[in-house]
Amino acid sequence: MSYFENFQKILYDPVGNNNPKLMTNIMKRVRMRANMKKEVVMLDPYDVQENETPEIVADKHHGSPIYHWVVMLLNDISDVNHDWVKSTRQLQKYLTDKYTVTQLSEAHHYEISQSSGDTSIKIQVLQGTSGATTVTNYEYEVALNEEKRTIDLLRNEYLGFFEDEFQNLV
């Protein structure tokens, strides 16, 4: 099943000349239920590899690139250019388009580590805070990109149920 296959068709007159066309209602949005995302038995964590697209991941995991929409919907990805992990080459281009060479090494923010038991987290703090480390624009952007690398994949035994649920929602 393709993503838009079950979307409602509407009459739309884009020009306003009283000659409407039958079109797929692409404005319809479907979100995964919060309780379904909590069902970890249905999901497998996956680390997206270099140059993998949602289509490649879907093909590897679900056996067909047509299920890329499942990968994207499950991970709240609406724009693959902004929400999906960038390859090294894409990230470098993005950084050179956004920053000058000097700006890349400038401070983005400062942070400290806080630990409690076995857990350690980073907290942003003001410049000059004792023990704070500088995070450059480059380090910040790389970390932001890496956060997108780990995604959830639907286990194949739930794929049919997921498609049925999707069809009911659209």
Can you say where each PLM-predicted feature lies in the sequence?
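Cell-surface/extracellular proteins and modules involved
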Residues: 1-170
